[in-house]
């Protein structure tokens, strides 16, 4: 039975929904002012795994991931680039989709952009004003009245104090608001901007929404019954963003609830959270130029999703070598996947039972991955003397790997992709010719000539490996 750690209750809880129930999932998306970095990649790969596993168990999922396409960061970046917000945002969204496609992420069922929901946001603010949870400040901003929401802090067990920064307030002078931590719902502007992506008309004059009300309004619009089964995001969003979301949503609809709050750990680089603010971010594009997307996924899954991941090239290379070794075990195996094999069937197998036990324990992917490694070792062990068993094990490895989005390439194609990454065309042609020449000499049992070519390939940075069935090569 699946158990998931709920941030709200601080414990693992049984996920006991009926299989025919649609599971509503909302994950906070990207603010589109710059390239996506691997902190984003980790968060969305984690929720990709969660959704894949729920679907494997037989659940129907309805997955929403929003796009923040209006924000101070976007406005400032557009000014720096001397381009319109519209051009900047659309360019970043296009690159984001390209990155996510390369990472083989499941597409959300809905991907609402904030600017497409301005009317809904205005309606939400009207309701908060009506319910006495918001007010118009002296500078005409609309702010949330924090003192009136008595349950504030029940998700994170944290409260604001004067030393903390609520980063949706926009003035350094706080004397125009009731509480120093009241956050902005609507940012007033003196006039409509020429760039209509910046300001919109409202009953309170021209302006634009604050960050927290954007997610809350989108959730309120899509989940009419006021229930979200899984709400997720990075742990950095727990406070104040998700705390503020709850305050707004419950102030609009007192019956609003989230069944499971799931938060992923941060990616740490150079002793800080990976962030453009700290100038320590590594873009997804950079990583994809060096590593296959499945290697990146494997790297993330080797650390439990709730734990921080300390990024280093050294660890990434180590994970790459482990992953390549597993893929290599699939070479020359005949994989047959019976898609009709059900969940109960797998539970009867000891190794696979351990895999599902790990996944049912709060998506324990490090343990699940170690079991995949064990299957790979058994394939190697049986390849020579028990081909039948090796093929069954290889089929199991691919079957279980698919649940995690892994081992979906033909092994030979995988090694071609990995080998060819960032290599010049001329070098690849030379290597291919030498490799085929060596295979020819091996077939003729001309071992001396075969060894000479192996040494030449090594000088080109290529290692050739042989087994009892075939040969293959990889770049060092």
Swiss-Prot record:
Catalytic activity of the protein: tRNA(Cys) + L-cysteine + ATP = L-cysteinyl-tRNA(Cys) + AMP + diphosphate
Sites where the protein binds ATP? 276
- GO cellular component entries: cytosol
Location of the motif 'HIGH' region: 30-40
Question: Which residues hold Zn(2+)?
Answer: 28, 215, 241, 245
Keywords in alphabetical order, please: Aminoacyl-tRNA synthetase, ATP-binding, Cytoplasm, Ligase, Metal-binding, Nucleotide-binding, Protein biosynthesis, Zinc
Q: Which Gene3D superfamilies match?
A: Cysteine-tRNA ligase, C-terminal anti-codon recognition domain (1.20.120.1910), HUPs (3.40.50.620)
* Positions occupied by motif 'KMSKS' region: 273-277
**Pfam short name (any one):** DALR_2
Cofactor dependency: Zn(2+)
What is a biological process (GO) this protein takes part in? cysteinyl-tRNA aminoacylation
Where is the protein situated, by its record's location annotation? Cytoplasm
Give EC number(s), comma-separated. 6.1.1.16
The record, for HAMAP family, names: Cys_tRNA_synth
- Self-association and partners: Monomer.
Q: What family does the entry list?
A: Belongs to the class-I aminoacyl-tRNA synthetase family.
What this protein is called in its record is: Cysteine--tRNA ligase
Q: Which organism is it from?
A: Buchnera aphidicola subsp. Cinara cedri (strain Cc)
Q: Please spell out the taxonomic lineage of the organism that makes this protein.
A: Bacteria, Pseudomonadati, Pseudomonadota, Gammaproteobacteria, Enterobacterales
